[in-house]
């Protein structure tokens, strides 16, 4: 199971390196690439947090 920090690092990579800009696409990629490695709620929190930081 991934930690919150690992999730945030991974999400940051998808935002900055891959150019993903919306919650749904990032979450779907995580589900496909890392099935069963994380819980839904912490993943969505990490995505929301980093997308908000990116916009600010």
Which residues are covered by each model-predicted region?
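Charged, compositionally biased, marginally structured helical/coil segments
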Residues: 1-56
């Amino acid at each position: 199971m991934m930690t919150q920090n690992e999730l945030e690092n991974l999400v940051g990579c998808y935002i900055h390196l891959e150019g993903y800009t919306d919650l749904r696409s990032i979450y779907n990629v995580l589900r496909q690439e890392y099935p069963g490695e994380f819980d839904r709620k912490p993943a969505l929190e990490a995505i929301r947090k980093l997308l908000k930081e990116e916009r600010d």
